[in-house]
Amino acid sequence: TGISSFQAIALSLAGRVGTGNIVGVSTAIFIGGPGAVFWMWVTAFLGASSAFIESTLGQIFKREEKGEYRGGPAYYIEYGIKGRLGKIYGLVFAIVTVISVGLLLPGVQSNAIASSMNNAFQIPNWIVAVTIAVILGLIIFGGVKWIANVATAVVPFMAILYILMAVFIIIINIQAVPALFGLIFKSAFGMQAAFGGIFGAMIEIGVKRGLYSNEAGQGTGPHAASAAEVSHPAKQGLVQSFSVYVDTLFVCTATALIILISGTYNTTNGDLKPGGIPELIKDNGIYVQNADGTKDYSGTAMYAQAGIDKALQGGSYHFDPAFSGIGSYFIAIALFFFAFTTILAY
């Protein structure tokens, strides 16, 4: 027996909605300007097609093992291509997936959780790491159905709460919305002088961050899709396509609006804490140089945090590298849920 279609989309969304929805979007705007948001939208429409194909194939070539459905790219590559080539290609994909999903990608997500919790609540990184490992272990040992049940409970809650924050910020800044969308489209095609020189980089960054966020075509989504029990394979393909739209068009756009409406992405011309010096990309990462000369390497999530603070405080707001305000707490909690459920999906 398999999991339900709703559990499959919740599990898939758990994998798609992660640090890329906050840090990735912030980085895209930081490097490519507002126009990068448009190219993330374009990527979502193209990526939905990839998600449909890979998830449908996962359903077609899935296998029942020990009472549960198993499938994914390694399965449909081996059984779809057939012969020695299919076995070799499927094995290579499986090995690469184990390395990336088992070792590399969880490190990105857990590091984001640890950094945000340390910034907001001053919790030592090792305590966060141990907590994540313990909770994760308890859930994983329950099997795929337990993982799906947790994802079903957490994913809708975290996505809706995050989007509601964005909606609230839009409402209190409603007069800026028309100009904001105009800015996105104008800068997307290099029609604004400020962003004309980075037209190519804008597209590249928008596409990269869009794919990093929604994972369409990466081969990570079909595993959850294959575990679902549906009447027709294409139904699960359509459901997974919808999850790409939710990830990029809703959650990523929520982050983009939080940042763009408040204007905190353009720190070279924005309000700064006295003595604070914003820096662009350096060889050793993105950082903000504080008034005392220290450097904060927390990354571009700072712009999402500052976006919430400025939207709530209005004209009295000043960019604060120390992240004092509700923004740091909200983003830390959001990153915890986003990143933790992504690790769970892996």
PLM regions and their residue ranges:
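Membrane-interface "cap" regions at the ends of multi-pass membrane proteins
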Residues: 1-22, 66, 230-231
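Membrane-interface alpha-helices at helix entry/exit sites of multi-pass transporters
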Residues: 2-3, 33-41, 76-79, 83-92, ...
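Helix-loop junctions at the membrane interface of multi-pass solute transporters
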Residues: 16, 25-32, 58-64, 210-233, ...
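Transmembrane alpha-helical segments of multi-pass small-molecule transport proteins
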Residues: 41, 89-96, 119-144, 161, ...
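Hydrophobic, small-residue-rich membrane helices and short re-entrant helix-turn-helix hairpins
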Residues: 73, 113, 139-156, 176-181, ...
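Low-complexity, proline/glycine-enriched hydrophobic segments characteristic of transmembrane helices
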Residues: 265-326
